[in-house]
Structures are given as C-alpha cells and as structure tokens.
Amino acid sequence: MAAQMSKKRKFVADGIFKAELNEFLTRELAEDGYSGVEVRVTPTQTEIIILATRTQNVLGEKGRRIRELTAVVQKRFGFPEGSVELYAEKVATRGLCAIAQAESLRYKLLGGLAVRRACYGVLRFIMESGAKGCEVVVSGKLRGQRAKSMKFVDGLMIHSGDPVNYYVDTAVRHVLLRQGVLGIKVKIMLPWDPSGKIGPKKPLPDHVSIVEPKDEIVPTTPISEQKGAKPDQPQPPVMPQPVATA
C-alpha cells in the first residue's frame, strides 16, 4: 500500500527534486549550453526534458550519454526500472535565454577575453535576437586588487511589479579566474508575443494598442429607412373624478 503524503509535503518534495536535478544537470552539461529542465509526470512514467543549445552533445554518440544520464537519475532518485525517460530539446531562441547567455559570457571570460568586450558582445547578440532590453553585471576583481562591479545596459528593463515574474529572465553564474572569482548576472526582458513562442502572451499593463477605425461607407444616393410601426401602447386607466356636492 502506497504511503499517503500531505499536499504540503508533496510540493516540498517536488521542489527539492527539481532543484537537485537542475543542479546536477548544470554541473554535467555546462559546456553543452544547458538552459533548463522541464519535468512532466504521466501515469506511466516521468518525462524529463533537457533544454540545451547543443542537443547533439547532450545525446552523445548513438544516444550513449543520454542513457548514462538516465541511469544516474534513475538510481539517485529511486525511480523504478523504465519509469523515467530523458529527452533533449533545442532552445528555440538562444539569444533570449539568460542561462545560455550567462554560460556563453562565462566561457568568453575563461578564454581570456576582456570583460568589457565580452559583455558588449553578449549585449549585442541579445538585442539582435529580439529582446526588449538586457542588463549584464560583472562583479569581482576586474582589474586591481579592489573588487568592483561593471554594469552594461541596453533597451528597456522593468524592475518591479508582477510583470517582472514572466517578462524578465534572470541567470547568475560564477567564473574562477586567476585573480579570483567573478560573479555574472544576466537579465533579459522578453518581448510581448501573442503566440507565446518567444515571449509572454500577456501584454504589459501600460501597453496601449490603438485599434484602426473601420472605413465608413459614404452613401452616393439619398436613401430612406422604413422603420417598423411602434406597437400600440396600453392606455393608463382613467381615475374616477370626485363629484362635487352642494
């Protein structure tokens, strides 16, 4: 008999599972453009969709690597044999994924590229991909012994309110260089997309859409309208008049 679990414990257990799975995949697939994970639970099995920019590297030669990852996940989280399946899905718009861009910037800095040049390259690529705005912050020992932070901003960026939850994609990464650890923070403001493919379907609260007026048909000849006759209204009852007495 399966043990009963309260709703509160179920939500906590699901959150811990997804966080631990995300941390494991981030560590394993960092060089393959790992950009997130989706978990879909069906009655028969659990489907784990890995979002990455280089899906061929995630799959490996003849699917060997994805099978190894499936075996590790199955053993670590105690799934029954054949009840968990891993899939690799390519990120549709790499320039609008904050995790992919943070990893890209991380490898540029590891390769010895200057901070300013690397950040402006990422900024330009994000804006060319159709983002409404972006912000890149790099902090740490950038030049001297004193730690400082450099911020690079382009376009529009919102910082407060409910739309931040679904319009702004954020990612934080750390890179270990010779002089110390640098922190990387990338924020991308997604565009409004009614189809929901590259951005949220819901428009911003302050978005004003102007509807084009319909073309009026100007009559060329005089016309007359035949209106239907009004139905006879019932007459109000006549009140009896008081009779004057002598």
Curated annotation (Swiss-Prot):
Q: Which Gene3D superfamilies match?
A: 3.30.300.20, Ribosomal protein S3, C-terminal domain
PROSITE patterns (alphabetical):
KH_TYPE_2 (PS50823), RIBOSOMAL_S3 (PS00548)
Annotated keywords: Apoptosis, Cell cycle, Cell division, Cytoplasm, Cytoskeleton, DNA damage, DNA repair, DNA-binding, Lyase, Membrane, Mitochondrion, Mitochondrion inner membrane, Mitosis, Nucleus, Ribonucleoprotein, Ribosomal protein, RNA-binding, Transcription, Transcription regulation, Translation regulation
Q: Name one GO cellular component term.
A: spindle
- The KH type-2 domain covers 21-92
Q: How does it sit in the membrane?
A: Peripheral membrane protein
Residue ranges, annotated region (Disordered): 212-246
EC number per UniProt: 4.2.99.18
Which family would the database say this protein is a member of? Belongs to the universal ribosomal protein uS3 family.
Which purpose does this protein serve, as stated in its record?
A: Component of the small ribosomal subunit. The ribosome is a large ribonucleoprotein complex responsible for the synthesis of proteins in the cell. Has endonuclease activity and plays a role in repair of damaged DNA. Also involved in other processes including regulation of transcription, translation of its cognate mRNA, spindle formation and chromosome movement during mitosis, and apoptosis.
User: What is the protein named?
Assistant: Small ribosomal subunit protein uS3B
Task: Report which gene this protein is encoded by.
Answer: rps3-b
